[in-house]
Amino acid sequence: MIRIETFGEYNRVVLLGEKRNMFSQQLIERLSGVNCDKNLVITNEGPVFSAGLDLSVFLQSKDAVLEYLFGVHRLVKRFIGCGSRVVAYVSGDVYGFGVEFLYFVDYVVAQRENIRFSLQGVNFGVFPPYTIAIGRSLFSHGHLRVMLNREFNAEEALHFGIVSQIGQLEPEKLFKPPPYLLGLLSPRRWLGAVVDDAIPYLYMLAEVGTREETRDRIRKFLGRRREN
């Protein structure tokens, strides 16, 4: 599910591609246990950085969905509160909450321009709660119109501000401020003041996501994915 490697000043957390690195309950638990007192690089093996939320959860009870979504929210807050720098090195396509997760790290490097980013869950009724809640603080109106209507590539994501750089990860070229300044210099930390604005949308997502129409769309999507 994940592999942790140590190199230099960073620990590298490698998402191993199981179930397209969707944020299953197991992956959430493993990531929640990662020590982030040391600088982290989060990256992936395989063609997908993350497939986003575990859509199969929405076929369960509303209470189960809420429990799952608040587990996701606790993970987000944990990474916002990490004491050291968190960098994402994206070498595969990114979907749904996988895109939103990148809002909560310090620096994002996409390996190449043609990596795809998509908030495609809106097609099933599974809307992106963090984009809806705090997206207007992060992106322009024009960028949100693209993000919420079609997939986009890494070059566009760089223009929007989701991606910081396209190319190879070179952590040694990043600034190295003393630890006591990281809280002042990290936009990720600033999001701690607004991230709970997403909570009403988590409740709304649990309600919308368990409607029978939404579940029918999810079943069809999961069925097509299994066939492929």
Regions found by a protein language model. Name each.
Residues 9-10, 34-40, 60-61, 82-84, ...:
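Short glycine/proline-enriched coil/turn segments at helix->beta-strand junctions
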Residues 44-75:
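Glycine- (often His-adjacent) and acidic-residue-rich active-site loop
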Residues 78-83, 87-97, 101-181:
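Crotonase-fold acyl-CoA enzyme core
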Residues 13, 31, 42, 54, ...:
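Terminal peptide-recognition signature
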